[in-house]
Amino acid sequence: MDPNTVSSFQVDCFLWHVRKRVADQELGDAPFLDRLRRDQKSLRGRGSTLGLDIETATRAGKQIVERILKEESDEALKMTMASVPASRYLTDMTLEEMSRDWSMLIPKQKVAGPLCIRMDQAIMDKNIILKANFSVIFDRLETLILLRAFTEEGAIVGEISPLPSLPGHTDEDVKNAVGVLIGGLEWNDNTVRVSETLQRFAWRSSNENGRPPLTPKQKREMAGTIRSEV
């Protein structure tokens, strides 16, 4: 196993522990707490994949961080912070919409690269909007936290989320997954639109009808899978 993979996991475990202590002292805002929950799932998946114990990794990560901090001067820290571009966290969904449990009458799940797509095939003839919470850097989507599909009545009928066992994805991964989800929902005669915020930062455009430019392959992929199972 690559030693850098191990040390990266160890440091991530310790930093998650520090953030959890911050949350326990009620010092974290809603985006902070949301990322904390998502990262916990990701760390569990990575630990299982790597065969590493999280508690042991956390202790090792603490030693790595302490060693670095001991060698780090305040001036070097200021220079490092100044050179790192800051990302922004954008929210289409409220914390309640993100954390709400939902169920599917006819479940359909598909993995597209590092993202998992879920939708309810029982939903038909509905107006649906896709909302997402994500981070942005250089005016471009950096990391998808969660995307959900809502009916006009507020019911959740679809979702795109990062796979805990496969951390890291690109804006192209997100756009491809959105295309697949739209194709699946439209197969059942639903009308789907994407939030203006997601259009702006994923596609760098905003269409009045809420439709980003999708390739025929994206729209066929989920629809073709659904057709074969009906």
Curated annotation (Swiss-Prot):
Motif (Nuclear localization signal): 34-38
UniProt motif Nuclear export signal: location: 137-146
Biased composition regions of type Basic and acidic residues, renumbered to the chain: 218-230
GO terms for biological process, alphabetical: symbiont-mediated suppression of host cytoplasmic pattern recognition receptor signaling pathway via inhibition of RIG-I activity; symbiont-mediated suppression of host gene expression; symbiont-mediated suppression of host mRNA processing; symbiont-mediated suppression of host PKR/eIFalpha signaling; symbiont-mediated suppression of host type I interferon-mediated signaling pathway
Region (PABPN1-binding): 223-230
Residues covered by region (CPSF4-binding): 180-215
Protein's cellular compartments: Host nucleus; Host cytoplasm
Annotated region (Disordered), positions in chain: 205-230
Region described as RNA-binding and homodimerization: spans on this chain: 1-73
InterPro entries per UniProt: NS1, NS1A, NS1A_effect_dom-like_sf, uS15_NS1_RNA-bd_sf
GO cellular component: host cell cytoplasm; host cell nucleus
Gene Ontology MF term list: protein serine/threonine kinase inhibitor activity; RNA binding
Post-translational modification (record): Upon interferon induction, ISGylated via host HERC5; this results in the impairment of NS1 interaction with RNA targets due to its inability to form homodimers and to interact with host EIF2AK2/PKR.
Pfam families: Flu_NS1 (PF00600)
Keywords for the protein's UniProt record, in alphabetical order: Eukaryotic host gene expression shutoff by virus, Host cytoplasm, Host gene expression shutoff by virus, Host mRNA suppression by virus, Host nucleus, Host-virus interaction, Inhibition of host innate immune response by virus, Inhibition of host interferon signaling pathway by virus, Inhibition of host PKR by virus, Inhibition of host pre-mRNA processing by virus, Inhibition of host RIG-I by virus, Inhibition of host RLR pathway by virus, Interferon antiviral system evasion, RNA-binding, Ubl conjugation, Viral immunoevasion
Principal subcellular localization: host cell
SUPFAM superfamilies assigned: Ns1 effector domain-like, S15/NS1 RNA-binding domain
Family the UniProt entry places it in: Belongs to the influenza A viruses NS1 family.
Domain notes: The dsRNA-binding region is required for suppression of RNA silencing.
Function: Inhibits post-transcriptional processing of cellular pre-mRNA, by binding and inhibiting two cellular proteins that are required for the 3'-end processing of cellular pre-mRNAs: the 30 kDa cleavage and polyadenylation specificity factor/CPSF4 and the poly(A)-binding protein 2/PABPN1. In turn, unprocessed 3' end pre-mRNAs accumulate in the host nucleus and are no longer exported to the cytoplasm. Cellular protein synthesis is thereby shut off very early after virus infection.
Subunit description: Homodimer. Interacts with host TRIM25 (via coiled coil); this interaction specifically inhibits TRIM25 multimerization and TRIM25-mediated RIGI CARD ubiquitination. Interacts with human EIF2AK2/PKR, CPSF4, IVNS1ABP and PABPN1.
Protein name: Non-structural protein 1
The gene coding this protein: NS
